[in-house]
Amino acid sequence: MKGRRASRRMIAVAVAVTIVLYFGLGALLHYKVFPEEKPPEWAHAKPGFAFETPTGERVEIIRGTLETDGQFAEVHFDIAPGGYVAAAHIHPHLEERFEVISGSLTALVGDEEKVISAGETLVVPPGTPHQPFNRGEVEMRSIARITPPGNGDIFFGQLSGLDYKPSFLQQMMLFVQAYDAYPASPAPAVVGTLSYLLAATARLVGYRGFYPEYAERFLRGAAQQSDAADPRTSR
């Protein structure tokens, strides 16, 4: 009996050590030895580029990351009647400010539902769960400012390439690792830890934080909508 218990203990210790080594070595390789390359400048959407999501959002770039030297991004952010942002989410390091131009914006901010009318502004501080809706009968039009911008003008192109339905591992790579976008639940600390540990595994099986082919396809479509230049054209 004692021998069996000792054997089980040794197996449990061996498994635990293997898991720790796997995640530790994976993190070392992913973050330090072979880090993912940053998205190239051409992947940022240019001013005038416009796109729509399946849930009724329409975004048009006014000033992106490159135009403001990474200080902020400014976009026309509109939602069709009955439209919504797909899921409640958190940006731990970004502030979002929505100045409503026409219609009304309904937003779940933390545990509170707010209605912002034309002429009013909604400020979402960093780390605050939020989800905008349009429950009105007319289009909600606003100007949104994101500070700092991160890679928000790249994010939608990546999401579009995934048909707006990323898998769990892809979310760990795309949302959290690359674009500072966390689901509202569980807590960001939990999601951040999971993302840190699973990113190497996700990358090992083929997931990435940036897909050039998605960016090119998306920006060509946005250029056609806005009569803008080819995505690889220099600024």
Feature map (PLM): residue ranges:
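Short, well-ordered beta-strand segments enriched in hydrophobic/aromatic residues
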Residues: A73-I79
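A cytosolic small-molecule/anion-sensing beta-strand core signal
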Residues: I101-S102
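Structured binding elements
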Residues: F98
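Jelly-roll (double-stranded beta-helix
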Residues: K2-F72, G83-A88, L94, T106-R235
